[in-house]
Amino acid sequence: MIKNMKQRIFLWGMLALATSFLVGCGSDETVPAAQHSQYTTFKSSGGALTRAHYMLNHTKGTGATVSWQPDDHLWLYLSEDLRLKDIGNDITTLTPNANFYFPSGYERNSYKVDFLGHTANTDGRYININAQHYQNVPNNTDHMRYNGDCAEGTATKVAGQDNLYEVAFTHLPAYLCIMPYNSDDFVRTGAVIKNVKVLSNNPIRGRFDVGQYGLDVNHGTNLANDIEVVLNNPNGFPMDNATMDQAKNAVYVVMLPGWHDLTIEFYYTSPKFPGQTLCARRNIGNREYKANSMTDIVADIANYYGANNEYITVGDEVSLAKKQGTVQVYEDKTWNSMLNQ
């Protein structure tokens, strides 16, 4: 059973509702402290909400810690046609706790609240798990907030406390941390991994109305079965490691949860084969990738294919490298509010 990410949100109300704010847009600026009392405030506490940009300190088989950053935003789901973005926050640096400001006048017993990733990837209604992710730094999750990172929760009024709401958020996507290495010293010396493709037997990406339907594929559009992560375009990441080296070349993917039969393709270059792009293909098999969890995939790519996915046969040295590669899969326990086990 998936555990929700829990924290509290506080609502400090004003008397008048500023109807001009009910348009789903807001400022990306930090709200000055002197103005805080003018707004309804959502305050996260007990750990950050659900951040992809700074999922820090993840290691194989463990969760991660998270932090808010200044351009994070929340959305209130008021109705099918009305989603309200906060007008700002009090965040000036990475922090586990933050205040998000909305107009006053909210008195329902509960509100649905969504985190929809970076505003470049949402209009407050839809988010996109994109066909291409661009990861510029090894072992970094910055790109995921542009590619479908999202969460939902219900803010419920706390009994006996005016304007105080508590909410439990849940990550909606599943996440992969892919860590390649090459046990063959002939090919790995100077090798650079350029991109990674994740192929599935069913949809792992698309466009979704998170507030109304979450990541339900029955209500998604632009569904597709593949995701490509382009690495530090066009330079790639080093891949001269003989064993797993997360800091050197870990790749992160955000995708739809569910049962998937995944195949991962690793495209890279080696000085031993000038002008060629090598490809190693690893099938993971059919398994469940739960929402609100990260699955670590450690893959030895020491057998080689050309770009046409056929074995390379250009000499005895290469034939020695044509051994069966290995892949291990480690699923983290579902994260709690700090993304730890």
List PLM regions with ranges.
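Sec-type signal peptide cleavage vicinity
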Residues: 2, 6-15, 22-341
